[in-house]
Amino acid sequence: MSETVAGEWGRPVNTAAHQKGGIHDDETAADLGFEGGTVAGSIHMEQFLPLLLDVFGDAWWSTGVLSMYFRQATVDRQPVRCFLTPGNNGQARVWMENEEQQMIMEGTANLGECDLPTALGARLDALRPAGELRILKNMAVDQQTQAETRVGSEFMDNQLQVITESHENFTSNAAYGQRVLSNTQVVRIFDPAEQRLAEAAIGPFVGLYGGIEVAFENGPVLEETAYESTCKVVGLGDSPKTEILWRESQLLKDGQPVARMLKMDRLMKNSSPLWD
């Protein structure tokens, strides 16, 4: 077994705390049983970048795959730390802990195609048939849509003011002609198609990320660049407390794949009047 490496402690900012009525809002989150407004898992994923570049090198920008399953929520500026154990098969094990050594998230990292399943892909493969769905009853596997999308420099500038782990490629266009989007911004660029597909869900409800896999196919993803995003429902499930929506999205530039994302969303049953 290769030696585990650890990153520096970080204090991620809850950048969506102002979004009232959502899981990142202190009052709403507390009503649903959380300690406070939660930090998005996509923000936590950014903290792994130094470890990923140390192990995989600059190839990470073009073909890196980070697949994370979220186990426990954190609140604004709660200290967390990343860990990585390289594997002999080209796939690394990655995870994050808080100061009490509780696991916040765990997953896998690799370059390009890998013979082993990713952390989130394995969970999708093992998905059991859904029981009763009320919020998602109008959604079905293989529903899909598409949308044009881009991330502008203003949004990127705002995110960089509070990013946990920055990089020169996020602040300078020297390497790729435009600045590179961080993980949070890559997740954001898939929003237009994702939201269009989610219109079939029956609100109101509060959702939170259960897991995210971001895979660069011909990366990186750049600011102020026009892309097309496709999104498809690839799984529906449930647990005692949530309904679960799985979506897979792909980002295209002039018809060529740039990146894809697999996302698991948990919709809280106790946030929906359909489950009263």
Region locations from a protein language model:
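Hot-dog-fold acyl-thioester-processing enzymes
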Residues: 1-63, 116-211, 272-276
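HotDog/MaoC-like acyl-thioester-processing domains
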Residues: 1-13, 75-140, 218-276
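An N-terminal domain-cap segment
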Residues: 58-74
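Short structured motifs
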Residues: 65-70, 211-218
